[in-house]
Amino acid sequence: MKKLCILLLLISASSNLIFAQLPGKVHGSSRVLLPNGWSLSPVGRSLPLGDLPLNIQLSHDKKKIAVTNNGQSKQTIQLIDVKTERITDEKEIGKSWYGLQFNEKDNKLYVSGGNDNIILVYPVEKGKLLEPDTIRLGKAWPVKISPAGLALDDLNQVLYVVTKEDNSLYIVDLTTRKTLKKVALGRVAITGVYGPDRKILYISLWGANKVVLLDTKLGQITDSIATQYAPNELLLNKKGDYLFVANGGDNSVSIINTQTKKVVEVISSAVHPTQLTGSTTNALALSDNEQTLYIANADNNCLAVFNVAKIGESVSLGFIPTGWYPTSVKYCKNRIWVANGKGFTSMANPKGPQPISKVDNSELHEGSTPDKRLQYIGGLFKGTLSIVDDPKETVLKEYTQMVYSNTPFNKQQQAPSASNPIPFKKGDVSPIKYVFYIIKENRTYDQVLGDVKKGNGDPKLCLFPEKVTPNIHALAEEYVLLDNFYVDAEVSADGHNWSMGAYANDYVEKTWPTQYGKRGGAGDYGGNRKITYPRDGFIWDYCKRAGVSYRSYGEFANGKTAVIAALKDHFCVGFPSFDFEIKDTTRCAIWIKDFDRLLAKDEVPQFNTIKFPNDHTSGQKRGQISPLAAVADNDLAVGLFIEHLSHSRIWKESAVFILEDDAQNGPDHVDAHRSPALVISPYTKRNQVVSTMYSTSGFLRTMELILGLPPMSQYDAAAIPLYDCFTATPDYTPYNHRKAGVNLDTRNVALNKSAELSETFSFAKEDEAPDLQLNQVVWKSVKGEDAVMPAPRRSAFVIAEKKKKDDDD
């Protein structure tokens, strides 16, 4: 009987592992597990939408819903019949972003035309969109305008257009289609609404934490009202006496009395009571009787439901689970309509782009391709529309429990052994005093460690095996091999925010697809624009507030100046940032000199961030360091770094954490979020494979616990710390670097299609070069010009922690 039970357990474990590897539902449940550890269990009926639906609008007669899909790939406008819950029309649009408005007769649909700097006006007849007219605000990108939210005054034939690139409001005469006036707003804005008397237009300043009031008669800003952090969507009740403001960076909704111009209540929409960012409140809807408020929490994958019958005394009713990243919500005919920006699941893309094909331009970040068979990650996660019947109290209770089950935040984590060097909670003592955090660029696990037999790798996908990366391999073999680690980001635009803040806000998430689709946009990420910052800053800000000493080498600093205020006087002058003309081994030499200087004075900071970016490579651009040499140089820099630190007198109190900011530039047979990561310390276990599921946020949480820092967001607070990687018994044996197995000075000399293509790439900053195309070039440089790169895989599922072997195995 005992043997039978053991057999059944083994079969069960095996089945769970098999099912866990399939995209979609977790075996035995209706849930989908995402790589970040959060889950989905959407309810209701659904319709397929396009790439990244950012806004849905209900017609005045409540018969139609319009959708604007604003992702990296093909952008479209869709019409949906409310009664039949069917899509009646879909039109492709070159560029679009957020703005969407029916006129009062519902026979015209106004659509913001993105960085073409136009408004398209579609006639609407019998559920169809006809050929649009155009209102031009100015010349197309690179002229900075970029229309966003729209407010239409049919009575006076005026269209108010909020713009996000030149921080303005355009007042347009619909009769002449000319701009009557341009009003400076001062900060990035997203949308505007006006009340029934049309006297005041309320505009949310995404980048200024306030709503400004425009007198429509004067055409001037006359007042402002402070809100919480990063206000985005606005909603007025029918009387116009209360304005609801979603605060994307604060997990909240501000309710403003429009008569007194005061915030009379702030509703917290987070799933659990917390001040930590991470819910990303970004859309609002009221029930027909205006007693119930529905709030979309994009990063909690749910709606928060509140009774607002008595303003000032609003009551939480519960939560409704949605799809992935809900961006818009409307209420119509006892149904709740929710646009899920990333759909219901991630997925593999076995028919990924083939850059050698003449019909494929997805790798160029041009947004769309005529070959519908292609599956490119930038536009892979198609949106969906959830249609949920207004739930009764008992049903809402069930939905609420589902949301709690999907949410790892605030769940009790199992405590490590008392002797584990990683503290269980803030304030506990760790023998580790110095943390070194190395950030690299864009590689997947299989690309680098796919040849390691004891890990879950695919050697066929390994571009940079042990000969090219002997130090990465040695460190993974001698310490811990992490074969179930996933980055939280998709690309570098959000990758450095996730790596340094455990969060990418809604501005970042909603704008990078435009840039990556080659549709214009500033691309001011990586600390270059304040609106991209998390509310409470990055990890250096937390160090500063806690009195933890810190220093940055190249990350959010360019060698001359600090990109963010917290790094002023806290970065290494002369340490290069993103510049492929400079080797990573040169960067390491600069760090060694600076480290030795600080060590001699006993001034080595407790927290150190180091940027080694050259594994990104320059492709096959003639005259540049070849991809193999660039990755080998990066590998040697890591080896020299660990060698120098491990021979120093502070090694016994040190830990090094190494990861990629994202994993976009390569294939992986498990999931393209999977990436190589290393943990090196005297307290790291030796010669072990650790298959616990870890994430970028989990790395950050571990470092925070060592340094005595609080979590920065709901994501690192919910993440699993790296307890399984550490031991209470230190091994102080220093590391000696492995010599490079390839010539580090090899340059690209071949004149072929890949070289010609590489000449068009810009490497001025992260992800300037198209990621898929660059990856194809790198693949060919290693495998040969005629080699075809396997398609990368993207999945919502992750491999659950492998069943641990018994101690006596």
What are these regions, as identified by a protein language model?
Residues C5, L10-I11, N16, Q21-N420:
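Predominantly soluble domains enriched in secretory-pathway, periplasmic, or organellar proteins
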Residues K397-D809:
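N-terminal pro-sequences and low-complexity stem/linker regions of secreted or lumenal proteins
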